[in-house]
Amino acid sequence: MFSNQLKELKIPIKTYLNTAKQRAKNAGYDPKLLSLSKDKEYKLNYDGVNFGRSGYGDFIIWSILEDRGLVEKGYAEMKQNIFHKSHTKIKGDWKNNPKSPNNLALKINW
């Protein structure tokens, strides 16, 4: 479960979720509809849509670790660029669906 990943990294769930909600708000989503996913495979749920694969880092996690000095400065942004380059190439109609898991991950997790 994602909460276990956060515990291992010593990142309070509230810290992660509040950051995710702020990123959701900045991207034009209603932060009240964002919560931790109850599905073990995913990190977050937005209005019934699970997204963000558990077990992997994301911009929020890498930024927190960067702030703590556990990864070098610029690492979160470098990982963000890699994620965006690969995931914007995914085929399908996800670009036209703001609630697609890929769109949500790109805008909230990354």
Identify the residue ranges that each predicted region occupies.
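Arg/Lys-rich, low-complexity, intrinsically disordered basic segments
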Residues: 1-110
